[in-house]
Amino acid sequence: MSNTQGVISSISLSARVRPAAHVLGIRGGGWNAIVNERGSVRLNDGSPVLDWHIAADDRWHDPSTEPSVRQTRRAGVPVIETRLRIPGGDAIQRVYTVADAGGLVVIEITNESTLPIAVAFTRPDVISSRTPSPRGAQGIELPAGSVVFPVAHGSTLRVALRAAIHVANAVANAVANVDVERLPSFEQLQKGWLKAVEQAGYVIVPEGAVAPLVARLRSDARLLAIPTS
């Protein structure tokens, strides 16, 4: 398997959308979320799907319908990157899972456009070190409780979600006190997953899309395996 940690497995959605279901979770701890081809996040606790919307200089952009969405699974491991074209550049969503506080799904929004933007999340229980905009979502109809955060040019907003199932009091307190800015980055998660899947055994494959595919199959197997204990 290739040791190149920047290799990206790409799915283009510019023409016809190809359905996708990316399984996220903790190595050895099972899966706890699925990300679809548009960046919607569904936890395994039956709670509402987390959708995202971007307010750019011209209007609100809905990734579930925009033709400019492109999605990548970085190096084949469970770090999902969804790009949305907006005036002046891209708004980028990255989703991955960390083991902190019993397991958190981390969602990052990076503004690579030349102008400030805002992002709306359709759930009120996202964990963030920032305070949501008191004005809420203006000019778009979203589910009750949706929250909006500004994202300056060149900056990244990070939030997290915790599945409601199996949340003991100690874990709930840990979630309440978590500092999302100190959670591992998507680069760290990518490196950790690559190391784990490569330790499972080396496979010599041609350069290109095959190595990320092998990494995806191995990482999905680790997430979906039934614990023996």
Label the predicted regions:
Residues 1-224:
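Terminal accessory carbohydrate-recognition/targeting modules of carbohydrate-active enzymes
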Residues 226-229:
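Solvent-exposed loop and edge beta-strand segments that line ligand/cofactor-binding
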